[in-house]
């Protein structure tokens, strides 16, 4: 919804981003929409005081909605498996039956016909976490038939029941079984058991590529991640049936204790309670920017109980110290790793300036250049540009984007490398990056000397030739 309600996309455009792919991690909240999906979407918007009539149901109408608002940057969509599954079968923790699986296949085909360029899964998040590999394989076959990208927030990035390396292998197996192009989203190794082992993820991708599989990844260049409260603090079984069912479980003292015991394990993955910072919590903005130790002192209880009390009042999100520098650097060096923010297009004023979101929305690309190219020099300038421009376009099969070439759309940045600077921080995230002298979108100048100029020149991309 960010790109519709704030088509200026300031946090991205000012740092030189001219294209955004929506719907990652299985979360295409805006399509397809059932009555229940619309209610859930409005609940999310209510937290920011946004009330919008949702008079669309499918991708065609949703993308037209964005077009009518004239975005500042180019936009393309993915159909998210989590949204698709809830559209067809709700939040039930079970396998899809044949009729439900066929309906999901049909919806993917409809979405492809209406202009989506990707199919995404969030296999860590409910309800995607309730699906089997076989379900994803069957759906990925439809993606492959239409030559769209399959991107996946894999089933685990740490040491829970699935496990990091089996989850990584599952994504590669989907490529092997279907032929689909696989993009492993925000590649990372989380938790004490996996810190220092990021290189093994790269070895896995390289082995798959040597086998002839089209597998790659993307990364945001930070040591902290960001996830909704329910997504990072509670076991998957406790989320079955959606928020209302979860709240009912929390009222049962025995179940509550069971959830809290598992929450302890989650907290320990993030360098403890001090590594869990509440980023977005409209219910009580005074708590935003505080870590779980500080919140627990205010609430006079444990970090685990504090998390549950927060969620009982409202969903929110945490920034989490989930990674180590060595792993982030190792992954950043890999040539088949795109740079991708995993963050929304935001603004430093208005409803989208609320909370203390992850600074990646304002600084991913600037940080990659400043830290890995100019700073520790682990990535060459030429390779950094490739991994932010032509390689992402290639992954999406975009035929006229990502390069300065004859008959290509002119999406161009002009800058001096030593002037690129990220200003957003975890404490003060709503700050624009600096250093872009000129940003050109579809041949039209959109930024001069770091300042936006009048007009919005982005397009909704619905085909590989747009």
Residue positions per predicted region:
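Short, small-residue-biased leader/transition segments that mark boundaries at the very start
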Residues: 1-3
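Short acidic, glycine/serine/threonine-rich loops at helix termini
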Residues: 5, 30-36, 86-92, 131-133, ...
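Small-aliphatic-rich amphipathic alpha-helix that forms the alpha element of a beta-alpha
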Residues: 5-24, 107, 384
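Divalent metal-coordination and catalytic microenvironments
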Residues: 16, 75, 115, 153, ...
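Hydrophobic, small-residue-rich alpha-helical packing segments that form membrane-like cores
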Residues: 28-34, 40, 47-177
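Active-site neighborhoods of metal-dependent hydrolases
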Residues: 62-66, 72-74, 78-91, 95-98, ...
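C-terminal cap of metal-dependent C-N hydrolases
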Residues: 245-246, 252, 330-336, 341-342, ...
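Acidic, glycine-enriched loop/beta-strand segments at the rims
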Residues: 318-328, 376-385, 393-430
């Amino acid at each position: 919804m960010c790109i519709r309600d704030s088509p200026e996309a300031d946090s991205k455009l000012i740092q030189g981003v001219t294209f955004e792919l929506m719907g990652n991690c299985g979360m295409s909240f805006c399509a397809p929409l059932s009555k229940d999906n619309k209610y859930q979407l409005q609940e999310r918007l209510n937290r920011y005081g946004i009330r919008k009539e949702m008079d669309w149901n499918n991708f065609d109408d949703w993308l037209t909605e964005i077009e009518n608002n004239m975005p500042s940057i180019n936009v393309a969509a993915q159909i998210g498996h989590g949204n698709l599954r809830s559209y067809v079968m709700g939040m039930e923790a079970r396998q899809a039956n044949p009729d439900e699986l066929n309906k999901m296949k049909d919806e993917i085909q409809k979405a492809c016909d209406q202009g989506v360029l990707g199919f995404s899964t969030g296999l860590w998040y409910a309800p995607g976490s309730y699906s089997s590999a076989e379900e994803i394989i069957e759906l990925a076959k439809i993606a492959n038939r239409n030559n769209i990208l399959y991107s996946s927030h894999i089933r685990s990035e740490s040491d829970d029941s699935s496990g990091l390396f089996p989850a990584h292998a599952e994504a590669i197996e989907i490529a092997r079984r279907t032929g689909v192009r696989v993009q492993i989203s925000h590649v990372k190794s989380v938790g004490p058991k996996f810190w220092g082992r990021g290189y093994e993820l790269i070895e896995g991708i390289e082995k798959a590529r040597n086998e002839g599989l089209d597998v790659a990844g993307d990364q945001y260049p930070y040591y902290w991640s960001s996830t909704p409260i329910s997504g990072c603090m509670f076991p998957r079984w406790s989320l079955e049936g959606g928020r209302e069912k979860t709240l009912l479980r929390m009222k049962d003292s025995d179940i509550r204790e069971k959830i809290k015991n598992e929450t302890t394990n989650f907290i320990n993955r993030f360098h403890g309670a001090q590594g869990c910072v509440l980023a977005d919590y409209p219910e009580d903005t005074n708590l935003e920017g505080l870590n779980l130790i500080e919140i627990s002192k205010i609430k006079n209880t444990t970090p685990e109980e504090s998390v549950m009390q927060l969620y009982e009042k409202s969903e929110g999100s945490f920034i989490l110290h989930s990674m180590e520098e060595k792993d982030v650097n190792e992954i950043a060096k890999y040539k088949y790793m795109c740079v991708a923010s995993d963050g929304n297009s935001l603004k430093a004023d208005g409803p989208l300036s609320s909370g203390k979101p992850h600074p990646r929305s304002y600084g991913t690309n600037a940080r990659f250049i400043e830290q890995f190219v100019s700073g520790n020099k682990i990535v060459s300038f030429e390779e950094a540009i490739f991994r932010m421009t032509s390689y992402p376009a290639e992954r999406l099969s975009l035929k006229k984007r990502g390069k300065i070439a004859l008959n290509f759309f002119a999406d161009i940045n002009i800058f001096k490398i030593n002037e690129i600077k990220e200003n957003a921080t975890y404490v003060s995230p709503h700050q624009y990056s600096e250093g872009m002298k000129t940003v050109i979108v579809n041949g039209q100048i959109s930024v001069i000397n770091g300042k936006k100029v009048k007009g919005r020149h982005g397009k909704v991309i619905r085909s590989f030739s747009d």
